[in-house]
């Protein structure tokens, strides 16, 4: 049951159920169209589907799985770890005080692929806690956290539009000291940052900024004089910036909430040379999640809107 439930939740977090019918297209040329009902029937043959209780917590915007663990994030209610013994989700951020409630908006999270107990949470809310953005790092499965303030580099609004999109932070499986992370807006030299020391320090990835995507100056949030660079001139809660980051096999993949060929780009880890991943990918919708199947293939989901509407597609 544990493995079956993990398969179901992993499929959910890949964006398969968020986008209606799924158009599964191979970048190698072949394609298959799957209906939502066919996918449901396939899963139903292998799993028992029920509900899991979370005692409070807002909209569950993402679920990630490791080898033997599951974590969930919410838009205003913190982050949780699933307890297989009790069948409950245990809150990991319940020690935050009222002045820190902005960090209960968890915009993205990831697990170190080499260690289920090492997790990273990208936290921030534009209208609480002085609009600060921090990365929470735990090396003991969420029992305790170190906190790294990255507000001067990027900022996120974990309760904004697009919060259901996938994880904008990723650890390099080949070198877990290398981590990439993306923001909704850039408050420094790039909306994409990286760490080379396991999250202790962070720096701007200027090659991503050279794509020229974040060229609008907006107030963050609206009623302040603090300025940030954004994809559009819309207000802060409409900004979704970097939607996904994924590191795999020496490559870093970065999805951005824009239309056009630069909505999904790739570079070698450590390189500043970002290029469009493929001309065969959609240019009229937004990359929402990236996952990897059992054979190591990339699964990329797209959504037609950063709100809760629009069609979608899944590419392999």
Describe each PLM feature range.
Residues 5, 18-20, 27-30, 34-316:
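Extracellular glycan-interacting surfaces
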Residues 1-12:
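Bacterial Sec-dependent N-terminal signal peptides
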């Amino acid at each position: 049951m544990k493995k079956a439930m993990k398969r179901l939740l992993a499929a959910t977090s890949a964006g398969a159920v968020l986008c209606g019918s799924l158009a599964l297209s191979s970048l190698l040329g072949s394609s298959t169209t799957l209906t939502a009902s066919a996918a449901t029937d396939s899963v139903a043959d292998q799993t028992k589907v029920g509900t899991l209780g979370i005692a409070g917590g807002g909209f569950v915007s993402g679920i990630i799985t490791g080898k033997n663990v599951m974590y969930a994030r919410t838009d205003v209610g913190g982050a949780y770890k699933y307890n297989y013994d009790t069948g409950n989700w245990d809150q990991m951020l319940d020690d935050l005080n009222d002045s820190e409630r902005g960090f209960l908006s968890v915009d993205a999270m990831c697990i170190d692929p080499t260690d289920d107990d090492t997790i990273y949470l990208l936290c921030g809310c534009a209208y609480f806690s002085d609009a600060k953005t921090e990365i929470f790092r735990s090396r003991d499965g969420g029992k305790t956290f170190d906190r790294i303030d990255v507000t001067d580099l990027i900022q996120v609004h974990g309760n904004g539009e697009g919060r259901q999109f996938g994880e904008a932070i990723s650890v390099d499986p080949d070198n877990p000291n290398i981590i990439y992370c993306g923001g909704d807006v850039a408050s420094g030299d790039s909306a994409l940052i990286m760490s080379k020391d396991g999250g202790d320090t962070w720096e701007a990835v200027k090659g991503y900024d050279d794509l020229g995507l974040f060229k609008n100056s907006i107030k963050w949030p609206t009623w302040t004089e603090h300025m940030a660079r954004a994809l559009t001139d819309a207000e802060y809660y409409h900004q979704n910036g970097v939607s996904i980051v994924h590191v795999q096999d020496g490559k870093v993949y970065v999805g951005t909430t824009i239309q056009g060929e630069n909505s999904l780009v790739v570079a070698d880890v450590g390189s500043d040379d970002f290029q469009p991943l493929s001309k065969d990918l959609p240019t009229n919708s937004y990359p929402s999640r990236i996952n990897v199947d059992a054979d190591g293939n990339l699964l990329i989901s797209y959504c037609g809107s950063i709100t809760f509407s629009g069609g979608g597609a899944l590419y392999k």
